[in-house]
Swiss-Prot record:
Protein keywords: Cytoplasm, Glycolysis, Lyase, Magnesium, Metal-binding, Secreted
Listed name of the protein: Enolase
Cofactor binding annotation: Binds a second Mg(2+) ion via substrate during catalysis.
Residues the record lists as binding (2R)-2-phosphoglycerate: 162, 336, 365-366, 387
Lineage, top ranks: Bacteria, Pseudomonadati, Pseudomonadota, Gammaproteobacteria, Thiotrichales
Class of enzymatic activity (EC top level): lyase
UniProt source species: Hydrogenovibrio crunogenus (strain DSM 25203 / XCL-2)
Keyword Chaperone: no
Reaction(s) catalysed (UniProt annotation): (2R)-2-phosphoglycerate = phosphoenolpyruvate + H2O
Gene: eno
EC number assigned by the record: 4.2.1.11
Active site, per annotation: 204, 336
Keyword Lyase included in the entry's annotation: yes
Function recorded in the entry: Catalyzes the reversible conversion of 2-phosphoglycerate (2-PG) into phosphoenolpyruvate (PEP). It is essential for the degradation of carbohydrates via glycolysis.
Pathway: Carbohydrate degradation; glycolysis; pyruvate from D-glyceraldehyde 3-phosphate: step 4/5
HAMAP family, per the entry: Enolase (MF_00318)
Amino acid sequence: MSLIKDIKARQVIDSRGNPTVEADVILDDGSKGRGISPSGASTGSREAIELRDGDKSKFGGKGVLKAVNNINTEIRDLLIGKEATDQAAIDNAMIALDGTDNKARLGANAILAVSIAVAQAAAQSKGLPLYAYLKTDDYKMPVPMMNIINGGEHADNSVDFQEFMIMPVGAPSMSEAIRYGAEIFHALKKVLHDKGYNTAVGDEGGFAPDLKSNEEAITVILEAIEAAGYKAGEDIMIAMDAASSELYKDGKYFLGSENKTLTSKEMVDLLSDWVTKYPIISIEDGLDESDWDGFKYQTEKDGKRLQIVGDDLFVTNPKILKEGIEKGIANSILIKINQIGTLTETFEAIQMAKDAGYTAVVSHRSGETEDTVIADIAVATGAGQIKTGSLSRTDRIAKYNQLIRIEEELGSKAVYPGKDAFYNLK
């Protein structure tokens, strides 16, 4: 038995300088776990609700003392004496206590911090690393999506699309994939500098230059890949997050940097042309979260050659994902633990995706912390892909360093899938 003895929460700070929730769970055998909730900038309308205080005199209204208090009172009272190793029972008890569909009463940020902390404490009690404790499938090291050019909501620049990423599919291991990424990141800094562009970084550690067009983001990355000594299309593939819900207004997509307005079909066709022209293997949220007809068209047109990832579309919600699978919408889901708010529901979404032949990409948020739980989740579930930012900023690097450690611990069991991570593409 590993019974919960005490729970304590506090307000801490995320990578954007905004408050977030941290929870500690202590078990009767002295084991202790800690969890911190991340926070997003571009959010899907159907995400679980972060509880914020709304007191404009403190942190601009973004304080989380109400959520902290909910942990220190109601959630603590509920969970004291409960068995920590029964994660599903713990998570379901918190969901029932909250009583809303979207965790709005207690706050998904409160529930998630406790969910993570319970798992960490239980793993420590059993003497296991977190990934081993959480294991639901064969271990797989995740191929990283490394966000090296930031735009959209993640940067104050002229680039409309939110993320341009590299994926080291040709690397033989996790640690080598990280080396490939770091070398390209440094090469890109030089490419941008030589062209007279700013080399300041955005929320996720990627560069945020004022480029002449959205397409130039791809061409400068291709230059950097070559300058670093790698081959685009073989060693490295490109991935994008268009975050198109941020560009959608009155049924059209507005690309401000190019002063263009596109219909849903035109948006799909634009992205499709890029997939033909460049080594792009994955596009996330190419359309607005409500534009299911557009996603259907994109899936029918490009779903056999392109990973079409639903983020705002599915918000890590098994119910919404199930509907998408039934309608043939997209072929991949982005997994953000705070979109749904418990580890149990996160694992359910990953398993549902796999069972349907969809891929799952475990992801950070733009407001991150030193918490590395998503690295362990990616390995434990065999998801095969992770999106955790660029090769700068400690809030991003913490996850890469954890993956290096896990790979070392696993030894010969550490399989790095490379292009096999895209098991549903032809």
